[in-house]
Amino acid sequence: MKKEYIRYKQTKKEFSQMIDHMAQLCKIPSISKFSKVNTYPFGIDCNNALNYILKLAKSFGFIVYKDPKKMYGFAQLGNGKKIIGILAHLDVVPEGDKEQWISDAFSPIIEKDKLFGRGSLDDKGPAIINLYAMKYIKDKNLLDSKWSIRIIFGLSEETNMLSMKTYLKDFGTPYISYTPDGEWPLIYAEKLIYHVNLWFPEIPNLKLEAGKVVNQIPDSIYAKYPEISNMQSLFKDGETKYDETKGILKIIGKSGHGSTPEKGDNAIIKFFKAFQEFMPKFKSNALLKFITQNFVDDKFDLENIFPKYEDYSGKLSSNLGMIRTIPGHYILGFDLRVPVTHSRSEIFSDLSKYVAKLNNKIQIEPISTKPAKRIDKDDKLVKILMETYNEHYGENLEPIAIGGGTYARLFDRCVAFGSTKYMHLMHGPNEYFTFSEIKDSLDIYINALYRLQDYDDEK
């Protein structure tokens, strides 16, 4: 029998405490920086974030564990053999163009019932909410003795996921689990993620620099070229800044999540659209041709390179996330979100064919691949969580597929479940979590943790 839905009336005091804990965690600039020789494998800030949340978890009365090598940590309620896992991450993407934030990205503020700050939505806020959901289960004695609940904190989700992979080697996969790092209602399929660099011959005297990570839409580009100040007339007011001393032009775009490139304003593409008009003599250049053939029409499916890459999980999408200038070359970094039914070998083959036709001096440098993830819509885990979500909102929604990548792809019997309907806010300037969504999320996670204990009883 399905358990009755719990409508939790959180006190104003506890809600304020929860928001404060989110804000304190978001103050820590935990951008993951992997090092094999560092005392802190993902940087001291990631370690500080882990220490903060483990201390909080311990104050709630949970069992806490920190990996001796500082790779990950977790907090646990109960001692049952069957573990309900909650997979959260404490690392964040860089803030991007600081001038586009209403406040410092790592000095969280509250405005109009919204918590602004890097990590508020992805994924520190959801981590704190789930800790409070566990606290409710503990305080109300709602955990069956055969179960335990373990929230696992990763420190490199935005980069190589090595932190959570290390946890898997040490402890294995939980009995069932979810990650609060996606989009409501529930994600049953995640596209393959393919990161690749393309090396192009340099255009004489043109120096370019943009982007810090490929899974983030670049919100600015810095360009140096003779008389480039004259290019400002091709942009709207407020879209450029020129440094006369250095002779560098900054073009301003708008950041966002690399899985939804259409929801930002890519500064790299913006620059090249104008540059081909400013310097038409370079239109035959391989880099200019690549950009104009694939990006200037505001489409991101790279159909010229990857024709008919589409299935039930959607179309292929591409984020041109980085560009660097080195002697003789530009290095362009791409984040491809590839439909579930396509493979890494297909991508490399089709990209190689296209590049060979365009210019044989272009080099392909594959960086990393994250495999696709799919779980059946009729799976017991999916059914319990979807029923819980739909009951909360009085809706009848179906699970969805996304281009975003979460820890769910590493684990068996795991899905991405929440915590927002506005995933495009992740990775952008002025990332925020609304109070209404925070309250709804807490309710949903409390009921999810309560009902998942009936997993073995579901048919």
Q: Could you tell me what each predicted segment is?
A:
Residues 1-85, 92-96, 331-333, 348, ...:
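N-terminal helical capping/dimerization or prosegment-like subdomains
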Residues 64-68, 240-244, 320, 399-400:
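Short beta-strand
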Residues 83-153, 159, 171, 435-440:
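Active-site metal-coordination/substrate-binding segment of hydrolases
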Residues 10, 29, 247-250, 326, ...:
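Zn-dependent metallopeptidase/amidohydrolase metal-coordination segment
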Residues 14-17, 21-28, 52-60, 136, ...:
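Generic non-transmembrane alpha-helical segments
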Residues 325, 330-400, 404:
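Substrate-recognition/cap regions that form aromatic- and gly/pro-loop-enriched pockets
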Residues 158, 165-340:
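Midchain, well-structured core segments that form catalytic/ion-binding scaffolds
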Residues 111-113, 133-150, 278-286, 394-396, ...:
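Phosphate-handling active-site elements
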